[in-house]
């Protein structure tokens, strides 16, 4: 073989070796697509909390749906939903006991706390007796419930005479929601005890609504 031919062959061998080394290095550095993707944690999906849909827990009591509440027995739905409704009314009334300017509004607030606390205890007794161990069944789709969600931050921030009018506006709306659900229970409840409580709620809270509206008419502009 001629020296020139040997020189060309040597160059070709060197180039071939360099190419093989480069390919090997490149394939060693590459990772499968799935491995690269799995090395980074997935960004968690943003989910709305119950408080974001029904109120802010930092500013007061909030109401929310329980999972599968609509398939629970109606009387259990009423007990759990009205109990939650009562708890929010009690919280509002306790704020009024401390901040209301009119003595008669403070007295009403105390009566709301006392009467609804008694009803809460009665409903808990029934729940323990009739539905022991059953999961919570708060159903915000029952009549009057969505209208009963209150902005506790607004009530907390109100002062002076404006507080009294704000409380009246919120509590009359809240009571109206309770009356709507109680009337529904009068027609649909299975237990006579629930029907009787429902009538009691309708009668008591309608009277309180009427009284608050009279006060509002007398106090506006004074």
Regions found by a protein language model. Give the residues of each.
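Hydrophobic helical h-region of N-terminal Sec-dependent signal peptides
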Residues: 14-19
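All-alpha RGS (Regulator of G-protein Signaling) helical domain and cognate RGS-like helical scaffolds
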Residues: 30-222
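C-terminal motif of bacterial Sec signal peptides marking the signal peptidase cleavage site
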Residues: 20-24
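Bacterial signal peptide processing site
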Residues: 26-28
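Bacterial N-terminal signal peptides that target proteins for export
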Residues: 2-12
């Amino acid at each position: 073989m001629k020296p020139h031919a040997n020189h060309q062959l040597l160059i070709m061998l060197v180039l071939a070796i360099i190419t093989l080394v480069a390919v090997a290095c490149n394939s060693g550095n590459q990772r499968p697509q799935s491995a690269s993707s799995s090395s980074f944690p997935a960004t968690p999906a943003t989910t709305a909390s119950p408080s974001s849909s029904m109120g802010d827990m930092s500013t007061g009591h909030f109401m929310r749906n329980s999972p599968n509440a609509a398939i629970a027995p109606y009387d259990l739905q009423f007990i759990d939903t009205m109990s939650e409704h009562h708890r929010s009314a009690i919280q509002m009334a306790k704020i009024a006991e401390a901040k209301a300017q009119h003595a008669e509004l403070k007295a009403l607030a105390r009566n709301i706390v006392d009467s609804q606390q008694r009803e809460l205890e009665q409903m808990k007794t029934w729940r323990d007796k009739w539905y022991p161990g059953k999961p919570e069944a708060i159903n915000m789709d029952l009549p009057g419930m969505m209208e009963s969600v209150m902005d506790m931050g607004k009530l907390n921030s109100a002062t002076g005479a404006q507080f009294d009018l704000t409380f009246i506006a919120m509590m009359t709306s809240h009571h109206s929601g309770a009356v709507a659900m109680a009337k529904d229970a009068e027609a649909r409840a299975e237990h006579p005890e629930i029907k009787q409580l429902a009538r009691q709620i309708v009668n008591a809270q309608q009277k309180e609504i009427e009284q608050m509206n009279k006060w509002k008419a007398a106090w506006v502009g004074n």
